[in-house]
Amino acid sequence: MKKLSKVICLVLSALMLLSLAACGKQAGGADDAQGKPIEGGTFVYAIEEPITSLNWYNNSSTDLGKQVFQNLYDPMWKSNTDGSLDYRLAKSVDISEDGTTYTLTLRDDIYWSDGEKITTDDIVFTLDTLTVPEVAPSTAAAYKVDGEFCTYEKQSDTVIVFKVGRASNLFKKALGTLYVLPAHCFEGVPATEVLTCEQNANIATSGAFVADSFSVGEKLVCLKNPNYYRTAAHIDGFEVRCVSDASTQEIAFRNKELSIFTISNAETLANYKDNDEYQVVSYPDGRITFMEINPTARPCPPWRPVRL
């Protein structure tokens, strides 16, 4: 993205809107014009990037993570605007007074989409994978403080303890956004091959939806997760088609093959904004980069204002 913030318009076909549905507040999503969730139907949309794996860590650093895979995987918790925690897979987290020890407790009613229970074994397996130098997905750095990976020790099937060298708000944020992999789906797979093995085309997930069919680089069809622990989604499922060309996406949208079409230029917007057949929704898309400064580090140069 060349700009930090821009307005993107989502165009919804009025005909497709009749079958369009969204998740409720607990599962995320949108409401109809009257503010009521729309029940049933399948949401169909296109993305430019090809989907080559169902493994979260093969997709977390791209827009696929936000657009697709956050519907398939749940984190430990999400942060509310007031700083409070909206727990998901985690039931609670207790932090020591010095901020170096985190005791995380999982819910005891969470299951993978294939019916297997989610336990701290899955957390240990995921972190063991992230610590492998040959794997080293970009998200692994989030679990390091001063270059050292956190330590972790399973206490029970629902309790695990993390330790870091010093207090770090960024580590707390990273722990909340930890997405775990199903250890039982990778039995016998070397740690160096967890992200590349064939099992990634058909693995269990923890979110509101589960993959029903998957064609690498072409299409992903998802249905409600029958074992989901929170309020079920209002829609029956969604379908993601990999279409790299924006013009081809627009043609499919006009042919009623897609529920939604994303545009980012005024010329294309003019074709839809005054057409009663379509509903145009605009939203700001901001990208924020975080920087952590340690003023106690030595040697530390004299502080002076810095223009970013």
Each predicted region: which residue ranges?
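N-terminal lobe/hinge region of extracytoplasmic solute-binding protein
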Residues: 46-97, 128, 204-205
